[in-house]
Regions:
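Short hydrophobic beta-strand element within catalytic cores of glycosyltransferases
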Residues: 320-323
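Membrane-proximal helix-turn-helix segments that form the acceptor-binding/catalytic region
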Residues: 110, 123, 138-186
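Nucleotide-activated donor-binding/catalytic signature segment of Leloir-type glycosyltransferases, i.e.
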Residues: 268-289
Length: 398
């Protein structure tokens, strides 16, 4: 298993660690490769990792990072050494850019090992990984088939000209030399993402498979739901997550209570609104309880969400979800059956759909009951692994 971070940090790490733990449980041998960090919870028997890259450091190392995050000779060399020692049947990559770089693909394929990658974002077709223009607060696909100069012009990466130049160079380089063509199979968590890859480059054809994300179904199915009168938002407080529009909708609906769990740069937009309570960043049982007891959960994301696990978790607990009719969200919610899809992302559009959903009691009760049935269609880690292993076996047998 390959990922730049080897400890629980975000969604891709949680996915990798949980999946790998289950694969080990059923008899598979697994080793890991990534960046060294004192927080690492997994590793490899050779003890080989790339050096930790602190992008906030000062001095000479900082000036060398632009070169290292485009192509890493260190990462390529070390992953080949790990492969020589462990002799895997297959390599499964997750997030590799910047800290590991796509250079490792060349090292892996030099060893003639089948290579799979789970695609957690739009990195291969968009320099900022999100298909999103932060300045205009709208989805953006200008680099998908157009020039990567758009990334530089719009300062798409953290609003930084330097970072955007580096990101554009990296994207252009690996697109030009067709590095991603060398991967044998791409696991896509949504059909939306799969279709974006296929429309971007012809060489992805025949190399993609959509498998929706899995969750710990036992944990969420056993939740004792005690419905309370609030609308839940769980996520990062930032523009692309639709925080500004959520704040506006709450102001238009003073009769409804909102609870927002998370943190982020735009938290100020939610402060001072009387019917919004902020809990801070929550994890574990507190987060599950907040989600499970909500009247509905809302995802007002402006960017194209891939396959939000929170939607799967909410449905498993019988909580209807309201989300934008875009990206992978539209695949997970059956409009009018397990939730409501919102076409108009404005505060007025969100407020209208909330009223329509919550003020029609019969409609709302049907949503809730349908969600309870929907959990049978959600993948567990056992279901997911069964599908994945079959794909592994096909590649190994070639």
């Amino acid at each position: 298993m390959v990922n730049k971070f080897l400890y629980p940090r975000g969604g891709s790490e949680s996915y990798m660690l949980y999946l790998a733990e289950y694969l080990k449980k059923i008899g598979h041998e697994i080793e890991y490769f990534g960046m060294y960090d004192e927080n690492n919870t997994v590793g490899n028997s050779k003890g080989l990792y790339t050096k930790n890259m602190d992008f906030h450091s000062k001095g000479l190392a900082r000036f060398l990072y632009p070169f290292k995050i485009i192509y890493s000779f260190e990462a390529k060399k070390k992953i080949m050494q790990v492969i020589d020692d462990f002799k895997p049947d297959i390599v499964h990559m997750n997030n590799i850019n910047f800290q590991l770089t796509p250079s490792i693909i060349y090292g892996i394929k030099k060893k003639k090992i089948p290579l799979v990658q789970t695609v957690h974002d739009y990195q291969m077709i968009c320099p900022n990984h999100l298909l999103y223009n932060f300045d205009k607060n709208i989805p953006c696909e200008k680099c998908v088939k157009g020039s990567h100069m758009n990334c530089i012009k719009n300062k798409c990466i953290h609003g930084s000209g330097v970072k955007s130049v580096i990101g554009a160079i990296e994207a252009k380089l690996y697109s030009w030399i067709e590095t991603y063509k060398k991967v044998d199979l791409y696991i896509c968590p949504s059909y939306f993402l799969e279709n974006k890859l296929l429309s971007a480059k012809g060489y992805y054809k025949g190399k993609t498979k959509t498998i929706h994300n899995f969750i710990n179904k036992e944990k969420f199915s056993n939740n004792q739901r005690k419905e309370e009168d609030y609308i839940a938002f769980i996520g990062r407080f930032s523009k692309e997550k639709g925080i500004e529009n959520l704040a506006g909708a709450a102001k238009l609906l003073p009769q409804y209570n909102f609870i927002a769990a998370g943190s982020g740069p735009d938290e100020g937009m939610l402060k001072g609104i009387e019917n919004i309570r902020l809990t801070g960043f929550l994890t574990g049982d507190r987060l599950t309880e907040l989600m499970g007891n909500a009247k509905v959960m809302i995802l007002p994301s402006v960017w194209y969400e891939n396959c939000p696990i929170s939607i799967l978790e909410a449905h498993c607990m019988g909580v209807p979800v309201m989300a934008m009719n875009s990206g992978g969200m539209a695949e997970l919610i059956k409009d009018g059956v397990t939730g409501t899809l919102i076409d108009d992302p404005s505060p007025e559009g969100i407020a209208l759909k909330l009223r329509e959903t919550l003020e029609n009691e019969e409609y709302y009760i049907n949503l809730r009951e349908n969600c309870k049935k929907e959990k049978d269609n959600i993948l567990s880690v056992e279901d997911y692994a069964e599908i994945l292993i079959k794909e592994y076996q096909k590649l190994i047998a070639r």
